[in-house]
Amino acid sequence: MSTDRDSTRFLTPCQQKSSTVRTASAAASRSLQGDIVECNTAYGGSRQETPKHRQTIEDHGFNAIAKVVIMDEFDELEIPCPAGSTHLRQDLIGAAFTNYTGFVVLNHFKGHMMGGFGGALKNLSIGVASTAGKARIHSAGKTDDAGKVWGDLPPQKDFIESMAEAAGAVVDYMGDRAVYISVMNNLSIDCDCDAHPHPPEMADVGILASLDPVALDKACVDLVYASDPKTSASLRERMETRLGPHILDHAEALGYGAKAYRLVSLDGTEPPSTKRVD
Protein backbone atom coordinates (compact mmCIF):
# COMPACT_ATOMS: atom_id res chain seq x y z
CA MET A 1 0.00 0.00 0.00
CA SER A 2 1.43 3.34 -0.96
CA THR A 3 1.71 6.09 1.61
CA ASP A 4 2.17 8.85 -0.97
CA ARG A 5 -0.74 11.18 -0.30
CA ASP A 6 -0.39 13.30 -3.45
CA SER A 7 -1.51 16.37 -1.51
CA THR A 8 -3.90 14.16 0.54
CA ARG A 9 -5.69 13.11 -2.66
CA PHE A 10 -3.91 9.89 -3.52
CA LEU A 11 -6.10 6.80 -3.79
CA THR A 12 -4.84 3.26 -4.17
CA PRO A 13 -7.26 0.60 -5.45
CA CYS A 14 -6.60 -3.11 -5.38
CA GLN A 15 -8.30 -5.31 -7.94
CA GLN A 16 -8.17 -8.36 -5.70
CA LYS A 17 -11.45 -9.83 -4.57
CA SER A 18 -12.68 -10.42 -1.05
CA SER A 19 -15.54 -12.65 0.04
CA THR A 20 -16.26 -10.78 3.27
CA VAL A 21 -15.10 -7.78 5.23
CA ARG A 22 -14.57 -10.16 8.12
CA THR A 23 -11.76 -11.83 6.16
CA ALA A 24 -10.00 -8.50 5.74
CA SER A 25 -10.67 -7.63 9.38
CA ALA A 26 -9.01 -10.84 10.52
CA ALA A 27 -5.91 -10.21 8.41
CA ALA A 28 -5.56 -6.63 9.60
CA SER A 29 -6.11 -7.46 13.26
CA ARG A 30 -3.58 -10.29 13.29
CA SER A 31 -0.86 -8.47 11.38
CA LEU A 32 -1.22 -5.29 13.42
CA GLN A 33 -2.02 -7.01 16.73
CA GLY A 34 -4.93 -4.62 17.07
CA ASP A 35 -8.43 -4.67 18.49
CA ILE A 36 -11.72 -4.59 16.64
CA VAL A 37 -13.67 -1.60 17.93
CA GLU A 38 -17.40 -1.06 17.96
CA CYS A 39 -20.07 1.05 19.67
CA ASN A 40 -23.59 0.24 20.77
CA THR A 41 -26.42 1.13 18.40
CA ALA A 42 -29.26 3.63 18.86
CA TYR A 43 -32.06 1.40 17.59
CA GLY A 44 -33.65 -1.69 19.04
CA GLY A 45 -31.99 -5.04 18.63
CA SER A 46 -29.19 -7.11 20.07
CA ARG A 47 -26.47 -4.48 19.62
CA GLN A 48 -27.99 -1.62 21.63
CA GLU A 49 -27.20 -3.07 25.06
CA THR A 50 -23.67 -4.20 25.88
CA PRO A 51 -24.44 -7.74 27.22
CA LYS A 52 -26.53 -8.66 24.17
CA HIS A 53 -24.05 -6.90 21.92
CA ARG A 54 -21.22 -9.04 23.28
CA GLN A 55 -23.24 -12.18 22.62
CA THR A 56 -23.85 -11.05 19.03
CA ILE A 57 -20.11 -10.48 18.61
CA GLU A 58 -19.47 -14.02 19.86
CA ASP A 59 -22.23 -15.53 17.71
CA HIS A 60 -20.75 -14.01 14.55
CA GLY A 61 -17.24 -15.23 15.25
CA PHE A 62 -15.47 -11.93 15.85
CA ASN A 63 -14.00 -12.97 19.20
CA ALA A 64 -12.04 -15.65 17.36
CA ILE A 65 -10.42 -12.95 15.23
CA ALA A 66 -9.28 -10.43 17.84
CA LYS A 67 -10.25 -8.69 21.04
CA VAL A 68 -13.43 -6.70 20.46
CA VAL A 69 -13.83 -3.45 22.38
CA ILE A 70 -17.23 -1.77 22.69
CA MET A 71 -15.93 1.76 22.99
CA ASP A 72 -18.95 3.27 24.75
CA GLU A 73 -19.40 0.38 27.17
CA PHE A 74 -18.27 2.44 30.15
CA ASP A 75 -18.26 6.06 29.06
CA GLU A 76 -18.47 8.55 26.21
CA LEU A 77 -16.82 11.87 25.45
CA GLU A 78 -17.29 14.89 23.23
CA ILE A 79 -14.82 16.01 20.57
CA PRO A 80 -15.19 19.21 18.52
CA CYS A 81 -16.64 19.19 15.03
CA PRO A 82 -14.80 21.08 12.28
CA ALA A 83 -15.11 24.83 11.96
CA GLY A 84 -18.00 25.65 9.66
CA SER A 85 -20.24 22.85 10.92
CA THR A 86 -23.88 23.93 10.78
CA HIS A 87 -25.67 21.29 12.86
CA LEU A 88 -23.23 19.84 15.40
CA ARG A 89 -20.71 21.59 17.61
CA GLN A 90 -19.50 18.42 19.33
CA ASP A 91 -19.47 14.78 18.29
CA LEU A 92 -20.24 12.27 21.04
CA ILE A 93 -18.10 9.13 20.75
CA GLY A 94 -17.17 6.03 22.72
CA ALA A 95 -14.58 7.01 25.33
CA ALA A 96 -12.32 4.02 24.62
CA PHE A 97 -11.57 5.55 21.22
CA THR A 98 -8.85 7.62 22.90
CA ASN A 99 -6.98 4.47 23.97
CA TYR A 100 -5.59 3.90 20.47
CA THR A 101 -2.60 5.41 18.69
CA GLY A 102 -3.54 4.32 15.18
CA PHE A 103 -6.58 3.19 13.23
CA VAL A 104 -7.41 1.01 10.24
CA VAL A 105 -10.91 2.11 9.25
CA LEU A 106 -12.29 -0.91 7.39
CA ASN A 107 -15.57 -0.43 5.56
CA HIS A 108 -17.93 -2.56 3.52
CA PHE A 109 -19.14 -0.15 0.86
CA LYS A 110 -22.82 -0.70 0.05
CA GLY A 111 -26.16 1.07 0.02
CA HIS A 112 -27.89 2.32 3.15
CA MET A 113 -31.56 2.86 3.89
CA MET A 114 -31.00 6.23 5.59
CA GLY A 115 -27.62 7.48 4.36
CA GLY A 116 -27.90 6.41 0.72
CA PHE A 117 -24.59 4.60 0.95
CA GLY A 118 -22.34 3.40 3.72
CA GLY A 119 -18.60 3.86 3.38
CA ALA A 120 -15.76 5.49 5.27
CA LEU A 121 -17.61 8.67 6.27
CA LYS A 122 -20.65 6.81 7.54
CA ASN A 123 -18.39 4.45 9.50
CA LEU A 124 -16.44 7.35 11.00
CA SER A 125 -19.60 9.17 12.04
CA ILE A 126 -22.25 6.65 13.04
CA GLY A 127 -19.80 3.82 13.74
CA VAL A 128 -17.61 5.70 16.23
CA ALA A 129 -20.50 7.54 17.92
CA SER A 130 -21.89 6.28 21.20
CA THR A 131 -25.59 5.43 21.45
CA ALA A 132 -26.34 9.02 22.46
CA GLY A 133 -23.97 10.28 19.80
CA LYS A 134 -25.81 8.33 17.13
CA ALA A 135 -29.06 9.97 18.27
CA ARG A 136 -27.37 13.36 18.07
CA ILE A 137 -26.28 12.74 14.47
CA HIS A 138 -29.60 11.27 13.33
CA SER A 139 -31.46 14.23 14.86
CA ALA A 140 -29.02 16.80 13.43
CA GLY A 141 -28.20 17.93 16.95
CA LYS A 142 -31.72 18.11 18.36
CA THR A 143 -31.46 15.30 20.92
CA ASP A 144 -29.11 12.74 22.44
CA ASP A 145 -32.02 10.53 23.50
CA ALA A 146 -32.17 7.38 21.37
CA GLY A 147 -35.73 6.84 22.56
CA LYS A 148 -36.94 10.11 21.07
CA VAL A 149 -34.95 10.54 17.88
CA TRP A 150 -36.88 8.21 15.59
CA GLY A 151 -40.19 10.00 16.04
CA ASP A 152 -38.87 13.41 15.05
CA LEU A 153 -36.27 13.07 12.31
CA PRO A 154 -34.85 16.21 10.65
CA PRO A 155 -34.80 16.98 6.92
CA GLN A 156 -32.66 14.45 5.07
CA LYS A 157 -30.08 17.04 4.01
CA ASP A 158 -29.52 18.02 7.65
CA PHE A 159 -28.89 14.40 8.62
CA ILE A 160 -26.43 13.87 5.77
CA GLU A 161 -24.55 17.04 6.73
CA SER A 162 -24.52 15.97 10.39
CA MET A 163 -22.83 12.73 9.40
CA ALA A 164 -20.18 14.70 7.52
CA GLU A 165 -19.62 16.94 10.55
CA ALA A 166 -19.33 14.02 12.97
CA ALA A 167 -16.95 12.22 10.62
CA GLY A 168 -14.85 15.37 10.45
CA ALA A 169 -14.57 15.45 14.23
CA VAL A 170 -13.15 11.93 14.23
CA VAL A 171 -10.81 12.58 11.29
CA ASP A 172 -9.47 15.73 12.96
CA TYR A 173 -8.93 13.81 16.20
CA MET A 174 -7.05 10.97 14.47
CA GLY A 175 -4.92 13.25 12.30
CA ASP A 176 -2.45 11.24 10.22
CA ARG A 177 -2.82 8.12 12.37
CA ALA A 178 -5.39 6.42 10.15
CA VAL A 179 -5.71 4.56 6.88
CA TYR A 180 -9.05 3.89 5.22
CA ILE A 181 -9.96 0.69 3.36
CA SER A 182 -13.25 -0.02 1.59
CA VAL A 183 -14.28 -3.45 0.32
CA MET A 184 -16.65 -3.24 -2.63
CA ASN A 185 -18.20 -6.69 -2.74
CA ASN A 186 -21.76 -8.00 -2.54
CA LEU A 187 -23.16 -4.50 -3.01
CA SER A 188 -26.75 -4.40 -1.79
CA ILE A 189 -28.88 -1.28 -1.58
CA ASP A 190 -29.18 -2.00 2.15
CA CYS A 191 -26.77 -1.90 5.05
CA ASP A 192 -25.32 -5.00 6.70
CA CYS A 193 -27.18 -3.91 9.86
CA ASP A 194 -30.53 -4.46 8.13
CA ALA A 195 -32.19 -7.63 9.41
CA HIS A 196 -33.68 -8.31 5.97
CA PRO A 197 -31.40 -6.66 3.38
CA HIS A 198 -32.20 -6.63 -0.31
CA PRO A 199 -30.12 -9.26 -2.14
CA PRO A 200 -26.91 -7.86 -3.68
CA GLU A 201 -27.27 -6.95 -7.36
CA MET A 202 -23.74 -5.73 -8.12
CA ALA A 203 -20.80 -8.08 -8.52
CA ASP A 204 -17.49 -7.56 -6.74
CA VAL A 205 -15.60 -4.42 -7.75
CA GLY A 206 -12.47 -4.69 -5.63
CA ILE A 207 -10.74 -3.25 -2.58
CA LEU A 208 -9.79 0.42 -2.37
CA ALA A 209 -7.58 2.19 0.15
CA SER A 210 -6.65 5.79 0.83
CA LEU A 211 -5.36 8.21 3.43
CA ASP A 212 -8.30 10.48 2.59
CA PRO A 213 -11.78 9.18 3.51
CA VAL A 214 -13.56 11.72 1.32
CA ALA A 215 -11.57 10.71 -1.77
CA LEU A 216 -12.15 7.06 -0.92
CA ASP A 217 -15.93 7.41 -0.71
CA LYS A 218 -15.98 9.52 -3.89
CA ALA A 219 -14.06 6.85 -5.79
CA CYS A 220 -16.44 4.14 -4.57
CA VAL A 221 -19.45 6.20 -5.64
CA ASP A 222 -17.86 6.84 -9.03
CA LEU A 223 -17.20 3.13 -9.51
CA VAL A 224 -20.88 2.41 -8.87
CA TYR A 225 -21.85 4.89 -11.59
CA ALA A 226 -19.21 3.40 -13.89
CA SER A 227 -20.76 -0.06 -13.50
CA ASP A 228 -23.37 -1.66 -15.72
CA PRO A 229 -26.69 0.19 -15.14
CA LYS A 230 -28.50 -3.15 -15.27
CA THR A 231 -26.91 -4.13 -11.96
CA SER A 232 -26.17 -0.72 -10.44
CA ALA A 233 -29.50 1.05 -11.07
CA SER A 234 -31.01 0.18 -7.70
CA LEU A 235 -27.95 1.32 -5.78
CA ARG A 236 -27.76 4.54 -7.80
CA GLU A 237 -31.39 5.24 -7.00
CA ARG A 238 -30.84 4.51 -3.31
CA MET A 239 -27.90 6.93 -3.15
CA GLU A 240 -29.71 9.68 -5.04
CA THR A 241 -33.07 9.49 -3.25
CA ARG A 242 -31.33 9.68 0.14
CA LEU A 243 -29.04 12.54 -0.98
CA GLY A 244 -26.09 10.29 -0.19
CA PRO A 245 -23.46 12.02 -2.38
CA HIS A 246 -24.12 15.32 -0.56
CA ILE A 247 -22.00 14.03 2.32
CA LEU A 248 -18.99 14.32 0.01
CA ASP A 249 -19.74 17.96 -0.79
CA HIS A 250 -20.22 18.93 2.85
CA ALA A 251 -17.14 17.02 4.00
CA GLU A 252 -14.98 18.72 1.38
CA ALA A 253 -16.41 22.12 2.33
CA LEU A 254 -15.41 21.44 5.95
CA GLY A 255 -11.84 20.97 4.78
CA TYR A 256 -10.85 17.56 6.07
CA GLY A 257 -10.74 15.78 2.73
CA ALA A 258 -11.05 16.25 -1.02
CA LYS A 259 -13.18 14.63 -3.70
CA ALA A 260 -10.32 14.75 -6.22
CA TYR A 261 -8.29 11.55 -6.49
CA ARG A 262 -6.35 9.36 -8.87
CA LEU A 263 -6.61 5.61 -9.10
CA VAL A 264 -3.46 3.50 -8.98
CA SER A 265 -3.60 -0.28 -9.26
CA LEU A 266 -1.32 -2.19 -6.90
CA ASP A 267 -0.61 -4.92 -9.44
CA GLY A 268 0.45 -2.46 -12.12
CA THR A 269 -2.54 -3.07 -14.37
CA GLU A 270 -4.73 -0.31 -15.75
CA PRO A 271 -7.10 0.88 -13.00
CA PRO A 272 -10.84 0.62 -13.65
CA SER A 273 -12.59 3.44 -15.43
CA THR A 274 -14.67 5.80 -13.31
CA LYS A 275 -16.44 7.25 -16.34
CA ARG A 276 -20.17 7.25 -15.75
CA VAL A 277 -22.17 4.68 -17.72
CA ASP A 278 -25.84 5.47 -18.40
Residue ranges of model-derived segments:
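Extended, low-polarity segments enriched in aliphatic/aromatic residues
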Residues: S2-T3, T8-R9, Q15-T20, A28-C39, ...
